Swiss-Prot record:
Disulfide bond entries: none
Keyword GTP-binding: no
Originating species: Clostridium botulinum (strain Kyoto / Type A2)
Name the UniProt record assigns to this protein: Protein OrfX2
Record note on quaternary structure: Part of a crude toxin extract that includes BoNTA2/NTNH, P47, OrfX2 and OrfX3; OrfX1 was not detected.
Amino acid sequence: MNNLKPFIYYDWKKTILKNAKESYSINEIIPKTFFMELHGTKITNSTLNGTWKAWNLTDEGEGSHPVLKCIIDDGYLDMNFGASSEKIPLKNVWIKLCMKINPNSDGTYSIPEKSSSFYIKDNSLKISKDNLILDKYLNKLMLSYFKNNIKNIEMFINKSRIQTKVVGDLSLLGWNTENSVSFRTMNEFIKKDNLYPKDFKAVYSYRKMTFTATGTFDSWEMTTGADGRNIRFKCPIKSAAYDLDGDVFNSSTENFLLIQVDLTYFDSKTTINDPTGENDGKQFNLKVKTNDDKLKNVLIVTYNLTDTDGSMSSEDKDFLSLAFRNWFNDNIQQFEQIFAYILLDETAKIPEYQWLKPTQISYGSASVETANDEPDLDASIFSAMSMVENNTNSTPSHAVDNRMLQLTKTQAAFGISFPLFIEHFLKQALLSSQFISVDDIVADINTLTITNNKQIIFGKVENSDGKNVDSSLKPGKLKLSLQNNLIVLELFDLTWEQGRGVTGHFDFRQEYELTLESKSEKQIPILKVHDEPEIEYYVEEAQWKANEDMIVSAVVGTVFSMILGAGMKLAGSALSKAGKLIRSKATTIKGRKKIYINRSNVRQLRKDSGVTEMELQRINRRNSSIASEDARFISNNGTTSIQTLGDMKKKPMSTGQRIAIGVKKITGTAVMFGAVGLGMNFGEMLINYINAMENNDYSAIPGINSFMQQCIGAMQWPDKDSELKVTFGKLQGIYLLGGTLEKNNKPNSK
């Protein structure tokens, strides 16, 4: 269970395709006409009038930020400048309206009233520096119109049959890995690098009037409200003088502009070092993107421009904003901040970690705001996403699950998708159990399951007749999987002859939790039992009736071996109590006698067994010793030969002990994240892990940070010398590791 709020993934491309394929249109609900006017105080009056042709969702939407393209059938923008006027035709002109939508409890969506989440992104009016005022007032009037008609827009959104997917656990949204930092951390990078433009002289001239803003910016800050593809920066003005065609005003405190830009990866010469790679990859730097149309490099979403006397009018501020628009679009390339460094197609020094090196890259962000609609810069997240091994993301977007840092409560995090975790951890873990050969194993990333694709011999077991017989599993009946963020081992229909010709069928299920614990002054991944096992047994009813006492005795022995980890001679009272329980649990279903031993039953049987803690420790040590001996036969590629497996399975032992020994090897392998390439072969490493777990001494075992170096070596943040020191680890829809960025083994003072 988790306390995360559900995450809603919006698929705008699928929404548009579905509506187009089914010829679904809702344009009949949009208003037919529009009208808006604005009366200036000194310079201009403006009027907007016309009729609508269509409103359409576009595939530019990201996350909960749809983009609505509103096309004008016919209309005009009338600008009056005292004695003169200009009438601009708007036939077939489109306006792109961006917004944020919030889900309601009744399945509908609403648009928050916060001004920065509702804005005009672009329009098709042909503009130049000479007529920016036309673009400004078209957008201003249109935005006022849309705000006055927000209920119509909400109705349009709610009728659009939006295709969504609700995700309870964390999701990388189709990406293989994600390297993330908080907005606050990114702002510390920006402040430290000091690469934002500081001094400005912004000028806008129109009809012999000139408006100038001259001053200095304080540190630019990444902030919330953008859709993921676009990134927003709050640009605080430290001090400025505003010259409004000869009238000069001084800026008051808390003046700022909120701008929005796109980012992109640029080719670069190699300037970073991946300590885990050969540094032969192609470097890309994530920077602000500039366009061919320099008037559209930067969007000013909103602003607060005030003077110390409070004398400037709204109209004055409009013209000042145009001056700043000119300046930002002309000078944004001076913002030389590199937000991330990536080495693409890098060769790992240790081949076993090649799967962590990016072969495709992207970026994204997600905003988190407080209950008071204030930016939560610690939980808001900026991410560099990647695909590895030439995998492809079939639904790529810049949307990011905004809950990652809310869960870790750290400044940085790294996520690995469950399909990768299955392929590179659990698959090897099941191979290491030596229950199965490499030829018999298959991974299903859709069900997050590793299983056997052929019938396998599980091992010899002594039956009630004193004979050593084979126990076997049919295809698909041995499973190691991820379920509800737990690693689950399951055996279904494990079958052998129990004696007197009776064939018994056992199911076994055990859940394990992957945690991160402080051991030997380092963070160590630990796979520990989550709860008691569940055991089920069935036999044909006719065989039960003919051999009940023998079957009950055999089932009791097997169940105790599964609970204790070995077959043992128990006191008569323990066997008697267990026998009564088995008989009481027997039910007849479709000609079969079935017995289900739940977790509560297992706890009672463990108690009734009379086995002391000292005896359990002895069993545990014995099983660890056997597991270590078995591990010596694992080759350096993590496999065991079929001949060796056959020899192991010929050694008779109780089913419970065979499972317990295999689990020792599974748990050792599943947490062996950072140990590859330490000069030992695979078997030796596994033995070290088994011994470390047995002795609770991890001094010779690499911590999780050795693995983290492999994860982030080719993906680095602006502070290239910092490393992610892991303090948090959890399976939560992804394998999530969180921590702090530290430099020279000391916390970064930024």
